């Protein structure tokens, strides 16, 4: 195994705007192009079929049965609800469903559907067998959600024409379609909406073994040479999340191209992850800030989510949906009726001795 302490790497200083390298692009143009390139790379890393999809074996097998049965009957599959933390493959799975069915995919998000008319316009443009993907479906406005009930059940909607006493309702038949909804907050879905999904699946965090396969596959797609132990190292720091694994791989690739002739070995991976502030547990700056606010600022808790978010300068939803699921899974934070509490594991991770009686202390 490579010894990182014996390997020296050079981290280049950033080039200032006043430096010798000039560009005809403005900062906004550069940012837009970089974001576009990152998006294209992310898309290229997505598996296209169920056979290519790594991990989530139960969801994959169940969904294969649902899709195969529908195709054999020549009908649109039941509507699908995918729930779970961000980055586990919900959007990718929606793309795969459309691919497996050989149909078109239309994509939108809950916050974008503010009015019933917004949804009606999208539904009326669907062709038979199309897949409609609504991300963050729990954030749909109520009028749009109520229109969706009838669309999901009867493949029709009532369009209101006019206002006041003279308003009339015109029924509009829809082509049979499959709705795929994704949510990170399944508890916020209303009962009537949840009940209209014929198949629901909970996406789980990935084990290191499956994440290693994700990293190896992504490296092959990107044309990056990587050692197996380096792939394991990246996977073990990816918080059980493929999206994070792919992102870390790209950052390690950048580091290796500057410092290791483009080849990623264990030492290069470890050094790169230190540079990008990802520790051995996969915690980043925000995760550690949450733990420090909880432990150093409030004695380990309990602390309410709003207070915790204020302490780290983030929205409560960010702390609750991005940081908390992994911190809970890693055994560092527990949720109680009075608020969040840091465990002994969290204290020790910050190099502190946990008080007696704390959860997980000896």
Swiss-Prot record:
Region annotated Head domain (RuvB-H), chain positions: 280-362
UniProt binding sites for Mg(2+): 91
Family annotation (Pfam families): AAA_lid_4, RuvB_C, RuvB_N
Catalytic activity as recorded in UniProt: ATP + H2O = ADP + phosphate + H(+)
Source organism (scientific name): Corynebacterium diphtheriae (strain ATCC 700971 / NCTC 13129 / Biotype gravis)
GO-annotated biological processes: DNA recombination; DNA repair
Full protein name: Holliday junction branch migration complex subunit RuvB
Main subcellular location: cytoplasm
Residues that hold ATP according to the record: 45-46, 87, 90-92, 153-155, 196, 206, 243
Enzyme superclass (EC): hydrolase
Family classification: Belongs to the RuvB family.
Large ATPase domain (RuvB-L) as annotated region, ranges: 13-206
Gene name tied to this protein: ruvB
Role according to the record: The RuvA-RuvB-RuvC complex processes Holliday junction (HJ) DNA during genetic recombination and DNA repair, while the RuvA-RuvB complex plays an important role in the rescue of blocked DNA replication forks via replication fork reversal (RFR). RuvA specifically binds to HJ cruciform DNA, conferring on it an open structure. The RuvB hexamer acts as an ATP-dependent pump, pulling dsDNA into and through the RuvAB complex. RuvB forms 2 homohexamers on either side of HJ DNA bound by 1 or 2 RuvA tetramers; 4 subunits per hexamer contact DNA at a time.
Annotated stretches, region: Disordered: 1-27
EC number, UniProt record: 3.6.4.-
InterPro entries membership: AAA+_ATPase, AAA_lid_4, DNA_helicase_Holl-junc_RuvB, P-loop_NTPase, RuvB-like_N, RuvB_C, WH-like_DNA-bd_sf, WH_DNA-bd_sf
SUPFAM superfamilies to which the protein is assigned, alphabetical: P-loop containing nucleoside triphosphate hydrolases, Winged helix' DNA-binding domain
